Each structure stands twice: as structure tokens, then as C-alpha cells.
Regions:
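Nucleotide-binding/hydrolysis machinery
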Residues: 2-6, 10-15, 52-57, 131-142, ...
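Conserved post-Walker A coupling segment in P-loop NTPases
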Residues: 6, 19-85, 96-112, 140, ...
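Conserved ATPase "switch" residues in P-loop NTPase domains
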Residues: 25-26, 123, 127
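AAA+/SF3 P-loop NTPase mechanochemical coupling elements
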Residues: 60, 90-100, 104, 112-118, ...
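Conserved phosphotransfer active-site motifs of two-component signaling proteins
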Residues: 66-71, 90, 109-111, 135, ...
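Short gly/ser/thr-rich secondary-structure transition/capping motifs
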Residues: 82-89, 125-130, 153
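Short acidic-aromatic loop segments in the C-terminal HATPase_c
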Residues: 109, 124, 169
Length: 245
């Protein structure tokens, strides 16, 4: 099933975030998405891309926390052969891969100051320079960045470039945690339950018993929608009698 079908809810804060994404999508300006883990930051990036004029160009994703600091710049901006130990051949970076499309940078706060400086140049001038080269390469990339860090506080401490934060904040979309999305636990529980039941080829979805539904709604869900989805899918998979709630 398509990932964007999981992007559902009825709470005001959630719908406001979706509306802001829809309104910003047609533009090529940077967007900063703020939210806890599991709230759907990557889904917002996909929505921004698919509703834009770049929809048929690449959507390239990079998790800035998934690589050691020594490799992040080479991964983002590419490198020439011999630029560092192990670089046996030239390689394009994520910016070049995303040319004419969208680059989604998750966990933005993990970027080193050196990588932030290079990123700022890419945003301001539309060009990148591979590691080991002095030749700038023109790129046309729309940037969507995401974080759960307090970037303004990091900027005050000198841990994040204030000028980069300003350039990436043309539109800021804040995704609410599931615990404050009134009514959405029930909506999502039913959706994930029905989807898993269909995958198991049940002829009907009995739903959860009222006391179970209350427990689900009372839980704080620190892992947000991702945690809820995993819990519901496992529960349905292990269901003893699909005829009974």
C-alpha cells in the first residue's frame, strides 16, 4: 500500500500541518519540517515533492545522523577520485543526484559546521563543489530539511549556523506528536487494523474491544504514529479469532 495513505488524521493541528505543506508544495523554496520521531516528517517531504512541479524528477533522501561526520560532506556533495583514502573513483553526491528534483535532509541538526557551510553555499548560489575539486557544479534542487532539535537554541550556542537556519526556514511546518492529536489514535487504529486484516485476507475487520481502544487512547505513544502502526499490525497478526473483537 502506498506510504502516503498512512498520512491520515482529523485533528486540527495535524490538518494545519498538511495544509501548510500543500500550500508550500508548488514553490521551490526550502521548507523546514519539525517533529518528533515517528510523526511523519518524511511523508511531509514526499507530499511537498509530489504536489510540486518537480514531481517527475528525483526525490533523494539523506539521513544526516546515519553517517559519520567524516563522510557526510562526501555523501552530500560528491568527491573526486583520490580525494581521500578509499576514494578510488569519482562519485556524484546527493545534490547532483537530486538535480531538478527535491533533496530531503533528515536529522539536519547532526550536520557538522563544515557541512553546514557547504550547504549554505549550495542554497544561496545553486552550486556544489565535490571534495577534491575546485570546479563548481550547478544544481537545481529544492531542499526539504527535517529535525527534532531546537535549532534556534543550537544557533545561539554556536552549534548551528544562524544564516543557514534562516535560509532553510522560508516555510516551517511543525508536526504535532500523536499524544496531542485529539481523536486521531482511534482513526489510525482503525486504519492500520483494517489494512493488516486485508493483508491477512480476513473477510471482515471486527475492530478492537472498547476496553482495548481506551487503553490505546490513554497511552502517550512516545514513538508516535510509527509506534502505533507497529503495535496494531503485530496485534492483528497475532489475533486468535478474527471473528471476535
Amino acid at each position: 500500500m502506498e506510504r502516503d495513505n498512512q498520512f491520515i488524521g482529523q485533528s486540527g493541528a495535524f490538518l494545519d500541518a498538511v495544509e501548510r505543506a500543500s500550500r508550500a508544495a508548488p514553490m521551490s523554496r526550502p521548507v523546514l519540517v519539525i517533529g518528533e520521531r515517528g510523526t511523519g516528517k518524511e511523508l511531509i517531504a514526499e507530499r511537498l515533492h509530489r504536489l510540486s512541479t518537480r514531481w517527475d524528477e528525483p526525490l533523494v533522501t539523506m539521513n544526516c545522523a546515519a553517517l559519520p561526520e567524516t563522510l557526510i560532506e562526501a555523501e552530500l556533495f560528491g568527491h573526486e577520485a583520490g580525494a581521500f583514502t578509499g576514494a578510488t573513483r569519482a562519485r556524484a553526491g546527493r545534490f547532483e543526484e537530486a538535480d531538478k528534483g527535491t533533496l530531503f535532509l533528515d536529522e539536519l541538526g547532526n550536520l557538522s559546521m563544515a557541512a553546514q557551510e557547504r550547504l549554505l553555499r549550495a542554497v544561496e548560489y545553486g552550486e556544489v563543489t565535490r571534495i577534491g575539486s575546485s570546479r563548481p557544479i550547478r544544481v537545481d534542487v529544492r531542499i526539504v530539511a527535517a529535525t527534532n532539535d531546537d535549532l534556534p537554541a543550537m544557533a545561539e550556542r554556536g552549534e548551528f549556523r544562524a544564516d543557514l537556519l534562516d535560509r532553510l526556514s522560508f516555510e516551517v511546518i511543525t508536526l504535532p506528536p500523536l499524544r496531542v492529536r485529539e481523536g486521531d489514535v482511534g482513526v489510525l487504529t482503525d486504519y492500520f487494523g483494517r489494512r493488516m486484516a486485508a493483508e491477512l485476507e480476513w473477510h471482515a475487520w471486527p475492530g478492537f474491544a472498547p476496553h482495548v481502544q481506551r487503553q490505546l487512547e490513554d497511552y502517550t505513544w512516545p514513538g508516535n504514529v510509527r509506534e502505533l502502526r507497529n503495535v496494531i499490525e503485530r496485534a492483528v497478526y497475532r489475533w486468535d479469532d478474527p471473528e471476535q473483537p
